Amino acid sequence: VTADKGLPRWFPRNATRGWIHAEYSLLPGSTNTRFRRERNGAKGRTHEIERLVARSLRGAVDLEALGPISMTVDCEILNADGGTRCASITAGNIALRLAIRRLIASGRCLPINLRGSEQDLKDGWTPPDLTSKERADHESAVMANDVAALSVGMVDGKVRVDLDYVLDSNADVD
């Protein structure tokens, strides 16, 4: 997870809330036959997976409590054997929580009432040091819940979870 310096260009100027974005990529050796890297941005399936992962993760974060920080969750698939969307959401959640914890510890992510104004920042304002309890409380405010995903399908009339590629390909419903 990378915390960017600013918010996306399309965000309102002087926004007080943050944004979570996801990027998803199958590495060339992640499938049985070599998968060619996508050029010039994500295409159909990849773009839709990125949107699903980002929406899922934004659902676990209070973007106002996060503050004006843009974060990108990178989902690099090393071994694609079914369930890559679910793995991206679950692992992305863990990585996002750890990144938020680091931002809080560094003073970049502060409770709303402790944030410096734009003028304060220009004047060289120093963020306050939070106690360990204040850091834990703010982490809970920013990310009160975790999110995880699990694939479910109906294969030969039986409900199955965590489908691999073969089961997913043969599922009646997934």
Region roles according to the model:
Residues 1-174:
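Polyanion-binding surfaces on beta-sheet-dominated domains and ring/shell assemblies
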